[in-house]
Every structure is written in structure tokens, then in C-alpha cells.
Amino acid sequence: AGTLETFRGQVIKRHTSNMESLMLESFQKLLRKTELVKALSIDSSTFEATLTGRDGKNLPFDRLSAGERQLLATSMLWGLARASGRPIPTIIDTPLGRLDSEHRSHLIERYFPNASHQVLLLSTDEEISNDYLEALRPAITRSYLLDHDETKGSTSIKEGYFA
């Protein structure tokens, strides 16, 4: 391999190593089972992610609950955003759907206020309860309600979703 190819490989390994640590740190902040995952590795040629469990063995993604897989995906996006070093707006649709109450609290307290300089949450009316709203309120600049009118077949935007 030539000098340029060697340099390219070194840069990719350095960046994947940084992403591994940021993604793992993000995942561990969101999980309620703090000892579930010991390591997260990314293959620098295929970019395939692998989890290592507390026992030191490979932890297949299908051994994670649906909520844990959702948190893993969120952690990967959070880690990538943090690794980029750029302010990237984050849009999250129905963010709390599959999660138990403890994982919901972790997202509300640890992720949403820190995910980006600008976070758009597209939530259902059931997802953000009064307790969650109070925890998020310091980070909310504006809120809107998407109001669908069946007869007109259109949706209007109204200010004050949490009013």
C-alpha cells in the first residue's frame, strides 16, 4: 500500500476509535442496565458495529430488547453527531414509543437537552407527560401542535402544543 493509502487507513482507524468511545459512552448514559455492554467496536473497513457484553463475549443485537435497540440507534446517532464536532440539528419522531419508564427518563434528562443545539421532537400527545414536560421545559424554546382536519384533508400548525 502506498503512503496515501496508509495515511487514509490511519485516519479512518482514529475516527472509528473516537466514534466507538462516543457511541459507547452515549449508550451507557441511556441504558438502565449499566453493566449490559462492556465495549462497542466498529470494523474500520466495513463500519459494522459489534457489542461486547459484560462477560467479554459478543452480544448480538437481537439479544437486546426493542427499547435497548432503539437506545443503541439513538446512541449511534448521538455519537456520530458528537464526533463530527459540528452543530447538527436533530429530529426525533415518536421518541418514547417502545421504552420503559426508566429509559424514557434517561432520554428526557440525559439525551434531549444535550443531543444538539436544536432538537425537534415529534411526539404524540401521550408521550410527553407533565413530569417529562417539567424536566424538558428549560430546554423548550417553542412548541407547536400539528392539527389534522379530516374534512379538509390538511394539517395546520398551531403554536403552543404544551399550553
Language model features with spans:
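Long, charged, glycine-rich C-terminal linkers/tails
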Residues: R14, R32-G53, I92
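GG-anchored amphipathic helix commonly corresponding to the ABC/SMC/Rad50 NBD signature/C-loop
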Residues: S26, A66-I92
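Charged, surface-exposed helical/loop "interaction arms" that form contiguous linear patches used
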Residues: A1-R32
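Conserved ABC ATPase signature
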Residues: I12-E20, A49-M76, P95-S101
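C-terminal lobe/lid and adjacent interdomain/linker elements of RecA-like ASCE P-loop ATPase modules
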Residues: S105-A163
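Conserved catalytic network of the ASCE P-loop NTPase/AAA+ motor domain
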Residues: L64, L80-G85, Y111-A115, R137
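Conserved D-loop/post-Walker B switch-helix segment of ABC ATPase nucleotide-binding domains
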Residues: R86-P87, L99-L107
